[in-house]
Design a protein with these regions (language model features):
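Active-site-proximal, structured, solvent-exposed surfaces of multi-pass membrane proteins
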Residues: 400, 751-879
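Conserved luminal/periplasmic juxtamembrane motif of membrane-embedded glycan-processing enzymes
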Residues: 2-774, 778-790, 796-802
Length: 879
């Protein structure tokens, strides 16, 4: 027995020694392993592809990116305006904690969806620079988009040269170039990180669960950090469909263990990615319950549909719906005329119908007035949404290869890609396929939280190139492809060619050239001319209903459709010819792939340049100029040295620009507080809509401390009745529900009476007393998220503050002791103040921020450790 134990010990020691030697050998072999990896075609091909896409990204924005020319994007300017108060505070107070509240818009709101930056983000922000290859902006963005798709296709084991074409097709899809011009940068960056996230998922399910989950965790973390929840949400549908594919595959192969291992690893990756962004996600989620994005008004609403969505109004959700025939823009870019406006040196310039190539030849019979009408009032765009910066065009070559893939590619992934393509197109139709949209609004969680349904076409922009490249590789790598795939090849190309031919011969098949918007504009002009006394004959001539104008509009717009239809047809026929030559062995397949890649680049490159080109950029001197120059009203208002007052700008109530300089009653943000929206609907909108303005409406302005009012004619008025930063009231009236609370605003005099929901009765009921002579309260210091007041009263009382109430995060103290904040007058804060002289402080300090930041830091470190482990596993892997 003793001998047996000794033998076991000796054997174990020998095994351990062998293992140690093996590990040592592996470590010594790392340089050799790296060399072996670099020699692999997929690896060196990856680096070659990176060089190619970098050159393309630089070339597309040449010479502007290298010269330092910049795009003054509209959305970025809006973001700069509403974030200016916080930015200025941080510049004046370096090292201070970033304020989570701003008074720049809507009388005050949290910054969770304005400038969502958290200390934990600094641990991984550098990855954005690395992933952009250090290229100048915006070339770095285009590089990021293509690099992400390249990683995903390589993870799918697509050969590198096919993957390169797919990456280019994805990156140069027109929508992405258009949103760069519009300034939707964080949407763009989110989309750039989605393909490599899915690539990690695919790699995990294909057996490399450790490396795949590490990559998925990294790119999911970066994707979520980019903070465009709508895009992340849409691609959850794609991720779910991919997982379902691998469930089916695991069942068919009976490989349950591998599937469960990958799923478990990916679940950990998902948790880490979410945890790394917990400050943004949690606070956004919590805030959404108080905003238009995630809650509906508590007021009785005659529109029951608004409430049933649990989010945004149905009409608001579907406001920007793609037209049925407009969906063919995926194949024919000018199927609806392209863009209604384009960025030109920092401004948005409407497109004119007379600027279309060949338009001059079609308007020779028009007089000067008719030409003026076409030039000023008729856009090149004639689709259904109110306006657009350009179509969603994935490329004629990609469209036809996608259709081919539907026939020749096998496996569940094909069905997932096809299903997601159809789903995205149907949902993008919005109100034009209301029954389908309603299914998602009513039964799919969170779908009703997002508007601009046409943007879900990003899914089709993703799925179509992926299936197209799978089809191209399948066709050109299958032996006897001519015999196997001749019929589906002819069928696919034939269908697409017929559609293009129809657009060329009979463009009217895709809808009328005269839109409802054209008619609406014409009616508006007619009303104005009639008001100024023009005769009916003159009005009829200056109208879209003028047969000469209508004919010219139809000729020019249908000419655009025909021209682009022929363009797409030629690309389809050229691709068909090249593929036939390849599969029949007439030319080398490598030449065929190169030619198709070149055609894809030229196709998308030329279309993209229609919507973003050299004219879109500002030279450095213009870029450095103040984007929000002061006008006379601004100067007069800013001459007021008081620390905290508000401005009611009636002409620009819904604009972000005034927020750059002032604390505004209005503003622009898609996720404003629901209660404040109620106040706008019931009172503040009367100033901008032309409805009768009542004394109650002015009372609302007074209680919001609107010290300055810019009237409809841009004249500036000082409001002598503005109630200031805080005041004591004689009485608080308690009501049973929000309807009564809102109704009382039309009755009370807010300088002496406040109204509150009865749930605040315990805080305020016994405290309200008649204001005595000498009772005062005034603000002594102000920062965006910290307010200090000095209060003096003989008997104590209820102090009302002209600050927007928010149910969590605000903490109040009286002489350093905690005090409760109540809500009065539907949107304002109130505090019960004891008798005597006191210092009142209010700070916005959400505990959730510090808690979630600590969790996020831990998660980021774990993701880095996971990546390090994955790298070690790759380097030490046995040959």
């Amino acid at each position: 027995m003793k001998t047996e134990v000794t033998e076991k010990e000796l054997k174990a020691n020998a095994d351990n020694a062998q293992n140690k030697a093996t590990l040592a050998d592996k470590i010594k072999r790392v340089p050799e392993t790296v060399k072996d990896y670099i020699k692999k075609p997929q690896v060196w091909g990856f680096f070659v592809s990176l060089v190619v896409i970098a050159l393309l990204a630089i070339a597309f924005f040449h010479p502007d990116a290298s010269l330092g020319n910049q795009l003054r994007q509209h959305d970025m300017q809006q973001g700069a305006a509403i974030g200016q108060e916080v930015k200025a505070y941080m510049q004046e107070n370096p090292g201070a904690n970033e304020p989570r509240w701003t008074n720049s818009l809507f009388s005050g709101m949290p910054t969770f969806q304005i400038s969502p930056s958290y200390p934990s983000n600094s641990l991984f922000n550098w990855i954005n620079t690395l992933f952009g290859a250090g290229l100048p902006s915006p070339s770095n963005l285009l590089f990021m988009m293509m690099a992400g798709m390249l990683i995903m296709l390589l993870a799918m084991k697509v050969r590198w040269y096919y993957a390169l074409i797919g990456a280019i097709a994805w990156g140069f899809s027109s929508y992405f170039v258009i949103i760069i011009g519009a300034g939707h940068i964080w949407k763009f960056v989110t989309l750039a990180y989605i393909p490599p996230t899915i690539g990690g998922i695919i790699m995990a399910y294909r057996g490399r669960w450790f490396v795949g989950s590490a990559l998925a965790a990294l790119f999911a973390m970066m994707q979520i950090e980019s903070n465009h929840v709508q895009m992340t949400y849409y691609f959850l549908f794609v991720i779910l469909s991919v997982i379902i594919c691998y469930i089916i595959d695991a069942i068919r192969r009976k490989e349950y263990s591998r599937f469960l291992k990958a799923t478990g690893a990916l679940a950990v990756a998902a948790v880490l990615a979410v945890a790394a962004n917990l400050p943004s996600l949690y606070n956004t989620y919590k805030y959404s319950k108080e905003s238009m994005r995630g809650s509906h008004t508590e007021l009785t609403n005659p529109n029951a549909e608004t409430e049933s969505t649990g989010g945004l109004d149905r009409s608001y959700i579907t406001q920007y719906s793609y037209g049925c025939s407009e969906s063919f823009s995926l194949l024919i870019p000018n199927i609806k005329g392209g863009a209604s406006a384009k960025p030109v040196q920092g401004s948005i310039k409407p497109t004119s119908l007379l600027d279309v190539d060949g338009a001059a030849d079609k308007v020779t019979n028009l007089n000067e007035g008719e030409l003026q009408y076409l030039s000023q009032y008729v856009s090149q765009y004639f689709g259904e949404p109110e306006g657009t910066n350009g179509p969603v065009y994935v490329g004629a070559i990609i469209c036809v290869l996608f259709l081919l893939g539907c026939f020749i590619v096998r496996g569940p992934l094909k069905w997932a890609l096809l299903a997601m393509t159809l789903m995205s197109i149907m949902l993008a139709l919005g109100r034009n396929m209301q029954w389908f949209t309603d299914l998602f609004i009513d039964y799919v969680p969170m779908y009703s939280s997002f508007r601009t349904v046409e943007s879900i076409l990003v899914i089709a922009e993703f799925t179509m190139p992926v299936l197209a490249i799978m089809a191209l590789q399948k066709l050109l790598t299958t032996p006897n492809a001519y015999k196997k795939y001749f019929r589906p090849l002819c069928f696919s190309f034939g269908i697409v060619a017929v559609i293009c031919l129809a657009g060329y011969i009979a463009p009217s098949l895709f809808g009328s050239a005269i839109t409802e918007n054209d008619q609406y504009i014409s009616n508006m002009i007619a009303s104005q001319l009639e008001y100024y006394g023009y005769p009916r004959e003159a009005i009829a001539q200056y109208s879209i209903n003028n047969p000469a104008i209508a004919q010219a509009v139809s000729d020019i717009r249908y000419g655009m459709v025909s021209a682009d239809s022929m363009r797409s047809l030629l690309l389809v026929l050229a691709t068909f010819a090249i593929l036939m030559l390849c599969i029949k062995g007439k030319i080398k397949k490598s030449y065929g792939v190169a030619i198709i890649g070149l055609l894809t680049v030229l196709d998308l490159y030329m279309v993209d340049k229609r919507y973003l080109n050299h004219d879109s950029f500002c030279p450095p001197d213009l870029s450095a100029a103040d984007p929000f120059p002061l006008n006379d009203n601004d100067r007069q208002i800013l001459a007021d040295t008081a620390m905290n007052y508000r401005v009611m700008d009636i002409p620009r109530f819904g604009s972000a620009e005034p927020s750059y300089h002032h604390k505004m009653i209005g503003g622009y943000h898609a996720a404003k507080l629901t209660r404040y929206q109620d106040l706008i609907d019931r009172h503040l909108s009367h100033f901008t809509s032309g409805e009768d303005v009542t004394q109650a409406d002015f009372n609302v302005l007074d209680m919001l401390n609107a010290k300055y009012i810019i009237a409809g004619d841009n004249s500036l008025m000082v409001n002598p009745n503005a109630l200031g930063n805080a005041w004591f009231v004689n009485e608080v009236k308690f009501v049973d529900n929000p309807d009564e609370e809102m109704a009382m605003l039309s009755v009370i005099e807010p300088d002496s009476v406040a109204v509150a929901d009865k749930k605040f009765q315990k805080i305020l009921a016994s405290k309200a007393t008649t204001v005595a002579p000498g009772d005062t309260i005034f603000e002594t210091s102000y920062t965006p998220s910290s307010l200090t007041y000095s209060a003096t009263s003989q008997k104590g009382g209820v102090a009302v503050f002209s600050e927007v109430y928010f149910p969590w995060g605000w903490e109040a103290t009286i002489d350093g002791k905690p005090a409760e904040i109540a809500r009065v007058n539907y949107v304002l804060r109130a505090i019960a103040v004891p008798a005597g002289h006191h210092k009142i402080e209010m700070r916005f300090n959400p505990q959730s921020v510090s808690t979630t930041v600590g969790i996020a830091r831990t998660a980021v470190i774990l993701i880095y450790l996971l990546l390090a482990g994955a790298l070690v596993a790759v380097l030490l892997k046995d040959k």
